C-alpha cells in the first residue's frame, strides 16, 4: 500500500509499475492481441511481455517497443512534458 503524506497517497515504485503494466495489458486485451502476438509485433520476447504484465518489470527500451506496436508511443513522448513547477526556484533555474 502507498504511504500517506500531507494528505496525498504516495505509491511505491512497485505499485506504480504494476499499474502501468495493467494499463498496457488492458489495451492489449482490448485489441484482442495475445501475449505471443504482442511479442511478435514488438520484437520483445514473449517471456519479457509475460513478466512485464505479471510483475511490472521491463526495460525502458522494451516498453517503448511495446508502446510503438500498440500505437500508443505518443503517451511515452508526452511523459514528463508538462510537469508543473514546484516553486519559483525551478522557474528561475529553467530560464538560465
What are these regions (language model features)?
Residues 1-19:
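A detector for short, charged/polar N-terminal pre-domain segments
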Residues 22-38, 96:
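Short basic helix-loop element that most often maps to the first helix and adjoining turn
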Residues 24, 35, 46, 60-63:
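Helix-turn-helix DNA-binding elements, focusing on the entry/boundary residues of the two helices
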Residues 32-50:
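Short alpha-helical DNA-recognition segment
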Residues 56-68:
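Short, basic-rich loop-to-helix N-cap that marks the start of a DNA-contacting helix
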Residues 77-96:
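Short, charged recognition helix plus adjacent turn
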Amino acid at each position: 500500500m502507498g504511504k500517506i503524506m500531507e494528505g496525498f497517497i504516495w505509491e511505491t515504485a512497485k505499485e506504480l509499475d504494476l499499474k502501468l503494466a495493467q494499463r498496457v495489458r488492458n489495451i492489449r486485451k482490448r485489441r484482442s492481441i495475445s501475449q505471443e502476438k504482442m511479442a511478435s509485433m514488438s520484437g520483445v520476447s514473449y517471456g519479457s511481455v509475460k513478466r512485464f504484465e505479471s510483475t511490472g518489470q521491463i526495460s525502458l527500451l522494451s516498453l517503448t517497443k511495446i508502446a510503438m506496436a500498440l500505437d500508443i508511443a505518443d503517451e511515452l513522448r508526452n511523459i514528463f512534458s508538462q510537469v508543473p513547477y514546484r516553486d519559483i526556484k525551478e522557474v528561475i533555474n529553467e530560464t538560465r
